Amino acid sequence: MDELELIERAKEGNKSALNTLLTQNFPILKGYIIKITGSPDVAQDVIQEALLKAVLNIKKFNPKAKFSTWLITIGTNVYRDMLRKTKRIVPLEEDIIAEDYNTEKIVMSNMEYKEILDILNSMPYEKKAVFILKHYYNYKYEEIAKILNCPIGTVRSRLHNCIKNIISELERKDMMR
């Protein structure tokens, strides 16, 4: 059974189809949330709430996007709400930096991994989220804009500023060759 068929059956109340959808997409949601929160404990809370919201709102899902994108959007919103409530940003885990980059590949290859993480952790959530979605999960700008509920131009600007900040900070620390 393909994803669209599972979605239609889940919308009709088929618990088995919904369970299959959630099981297939759980690793993607979990990986993203752990990376964005940096804390397995916080991630567990966000994931549980996101899955609950997905179950309760399955009939509202519009299959124009992938189911995993919808789950990540819900998870992002849950975490964003949590940040608003707690007014603190949780650091990222050290496994956030992916090995394969596009334009940043040269810059990233010259830097100390830990320093990049420290710099990334000091940035606002919005910039971190864009960086993670683009470079770790290889989402397109349009998909990131939908997930974060902002214009594509804002996504591009946040990513550009994030990379610019990383480069600037590394130059300041005299780590660029």
Please place each PLM-identified region on the residue numbering.
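DNA-recognition helix of helix-turn-helix
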Residues: 80, 127, 146-173
